[in-house]
Every structure is written in structure tokens, then in C-alpha cells.
UniProtKB/Swiss-Prot annotation:
Organism: Pasteurella multocida (strain Pm70)
Keyword Signal assigned: no
Family to which this protein belongs: Belongs to the TRAFAC class OBG-HflX-like GTPase superfamily. OBG GTPase family. YchF/OLA1 subfamily.
Keywords in alphabetical order: ATP-binding, Magnesium, Metal-binding, Nucleotide-binding
Protein name: Ribosome-binding ATPase YchF
Keyword Cytoplasm: no
Top-level taxon in the UniProt lineage: Bacteria
GN (gene name): ychF
């Protein structure tokens, strides 16, 4: 399990350049030839240097990173929620994603026309957010009509859902975001099935010129907006990312060193998405394979075992655990055991990021 992030943005903001760089760097998946309706989907490996460090010690036959899926949603335009452009299909495609990566143009280039005729990140963000809010408003109004009938018949769940929808409605009518409303756990659970777009965790991917990472008023504006929303901003230069994606590993390292960059910006995008969804990684490390697994933060040992196979959760007995730092420091399982760093945990154990685990189960 990884996660699915929909990449949205207005036309000509560098969205497809960024997406193509992401998927070139990754594993080719269901890459439909881009047509007007189907989004492009790419699966990318999660960059995690810990995996290589574990493999260095264990020397497995293969190393498997955890992955994420990115979906390139074609350029949204004003009126998309009413079916303008290819609106309806695209909004339906975003609905299927777990998070939204909103690409915002923060660079000037006379050769690349901006749809609104000028660079204005605040307006661009507003255009997209308004379309998402209008699409949610439509879903909300229809839900209210259905729920009112059921609530009249005394349906308790319908009454509860209706009370939430009535809280959400005025916010959407003002083109606001549902994620700005303080909803508790039960309320969020009750409306989960609606897949509201403005409830999805969102990050802004600010597409800048090569020299636009500092002293860039457009980028500053995106940061201001994100801060108000409690959203994350990841600045990247899609043009550089697309060059990096064409290089082999050795050339990549050299190219990054020449630019004075530690790692490709896409790594930051992938990690920010991971964080956005409250995900973390644990590892299994054996001679056959060293592998990374994705779980929600706060998952118990049995729930974490289930991502390998549901039988592991059903027949869970115990988990053998070594913290990542201990595994590295004591050069593997035997060393960690000798140092007293190997332990057995029960079904209530909350798995920590980086735990190296082996599950005992009985089916």
C-alpha cells in the first residue's frame, strides 16, 4: 500500500512536465496513452536511504521500496464543476485520490502562455479551489435532499449525517474548503464515503525557475496562502526535474552536485505527500528481500502485519522488533540481539517509523 495523489493545476503551469519527470523516475504502471478523459497514472518508489543502509548489512537477493501512485488530472479550467473543458470526468478522477498536489506557476516565461494572461498564484489557486468547492457543493446539496427524506423516517444515521451536511453547506456556498471546518472523528467517519474534494489533504507544488527558489514574490504569495490553510508548500523546478529524470544514477549525482542540490525536488514532493497522509514506514529484512511497508502513523502491530498478508493479522502471536538505529548500529539482527536491542511485542504495540520487524503468526 502506498497512496494515490492527484496532480491538479491550470493548463500551462508545468503539471505534465512534473508528472512525466515523476513517472520517468519511477516504475511504469498503467500508463494509458494520454487522451482527453483517462488520467495518466504513474507509480513511483518512495526515496528512503534507510532501505539501502539495511540492504548493505543484510545483503538480500532483492530490495523493494514502498510505492506511491500519482495521477495526472488534465488542466482544470474555470467552469470545470459545470462540465466546462473536460470538467466532470476530471473531477471524478480526483475524487478517487487520497491527496491533492496542486501545481502553481511561480515563474515568468514569455514563451509559455498563462491561461489568464498574467502570473498570479493567488488567482490561480482561487480558480481551482472554487471549482473543487462547487463540485463539493453539488454533492452536498444532493446528499441533503436524500438525507432529509431518510431523517423524516426516523433514520438516526441520516439525522447525524444531515447535521454535518448543514454545517458544511454554508462554507461551500462561499467557495470555502471543508478541511477548514473543525469536524470531529465521528463526523469525518460519517462523511468519508462522499469523497469530498475540499476535505482531501492538499500540498502546493510551486513550480519555479532554476533561480526562483529565493527572492521570488510568487513563491512567497503561495506560502502565505498555504500558511492560512495549514497546507504544505514544496518548491520545485519542473524543467530541472525533467532533465534529472533523463539521466542515469551516476550522471544524476554529478548533475545535482553541479547545481549544489542534495536530492531531486521530486523526492521532496513524494515525502511531503507521505507526511500529508500521516503515513510511515516499517521494514522487513531477510536474506530473500529487504522491503519497506507503508502504514498509517499509530497502527498497531497486527494492523501493520496485515499489509503483508491478512493472515498475519488474523493469526498474530507476537512481533519481533528492532529499532532501525539499533539495527544499523549493531550491524544486523544478531548484533542487536547481543546488545539486548531485540524485543518481542504484543498486539497492542504501536509500530514506530523505521522499526525492523518479523511477525510470528499461526493460521
Amino acid at each position: 500500500m502506498g497512496f494515490k495523489c492527484g496532480i491538479v493545476g491550470l493548463p500551462n503551469v508545468g503539471k505534465s512536465t512534473l508528472f512525466n519527470a515523476l513517472t520517468k523516475a519511477g516504475i511504469e504502471a498503467a500508463n494509458y496513452p494520454f487522451c482527453t478523459i483517462e488520467p495518466n497514472t504513474g507509480v513511483v518508489p518512495m526515496p528512503d536511504p534507510r532501505l539501502d543502509a539495511l540492504a548493505e548489512i543484510v545483503k538480500p537477493e532483492r530490495v523493494l521500496p514502498t510505492t506511491m501512485e500519482f495521477v495526472d488530472i488534465a488542466g482544470l479550467v474555470a467552469g470545470a464543476s459545470k462540465g466546462e473543458g473536460l470538467g466532470n470526468k476530471f473531477l471524478a478522477n480526483i475524487r478517487e485520490t487520497d491527496a491533492i498536489g496542486h501545481v502553481v506557476r511561480c515563474f515568468e516565461n514569455d514563451d509559455i502562455v498563462h491561461v489568464a494572461g498574467q502570473i498570479n498564484p493567488a488567482e490561480d489557486i482561487d480558480t481551482i479551489n472554487t471549482e473543487l468547492a462547487l463540485a463539493d457543493l453539488d454533492s452536498c446539496e444532493r446528499a441533503i435532499q436524500r438525507l432529509q427524506k431518510r431523517a423524516k423516517g426516523g433514520d438516526k444515521d441520516a439525522k447525524f449525517e444531515l447535521s454535518i451536511m448543514e454545517k458544511i453547506l454554508p462554507v461551500l456556498e462561499n467557495a470555502g474548503m471543508i478541511r477548514s471546518i473543525d469536524l470531529d472523528k465521528d463526523e469525518l467517519q460519517a462523511i468519508k464515503g462522499y469523497n469530498f474534494l475540499t476535505l482531501k489533504p492538499t500540498m502546493y507544488i510551486a513550480n519555479v525557475n532554476e533561480d526562483g527558489f529565493e527572492n521570488n514574490p510568487y513563491l512567497d504569495r503561495v506560502r502565505e496562502i498555504a500558511e492560512k490553510e495549514g497546507a504544505v508548500v514544496v518548491p520545485v523546478c519542473a524543467a530541472i526535474e525533467s532533465e534529472i529524470a533523463e539521466l542515469d544514477d551516476d550522471e544524476k549525482i554529478e548533475f545535482l552536485q553541479d547545481l549544489g542540490i542534495e536530492e531531486p525536488g521530486l523526492n521532496r514532493v513524494i515525502r511531503a505527500g507521505y507526511k500529508l497522509l500521516n503515513l510511515q514506514t516499517y521494514f522487513t529484512a531477510g536474506v530473500k528481500e529487504v522491503r519497506a511497508w507503508t502504514i498509517p502513523i499509530g497502527a498497531t502491530a497486527p494492523k501493520s502485519a496485515a499489509v503483508i498478508h491478512t493472515d498475519f493479522e488474523k493469526g498474530f502471536i507476537r512481533a519481533e522488533v528492532i529499532a532501525y538505529d539499533d539495527f544499523i548500529q549493531y550491524k544486523g539482527e544478531a548484533g542487536a540481539k547481543e546488545a539486548g536491542k531485540w524485543r518481542l511485542e504484543g498486539k497492542d504495540y504501536i509500530v514506530q517509523d523505521g522499526d525492523v520487524m518479523h511477525f510470528r503468526f499461526n493460521v
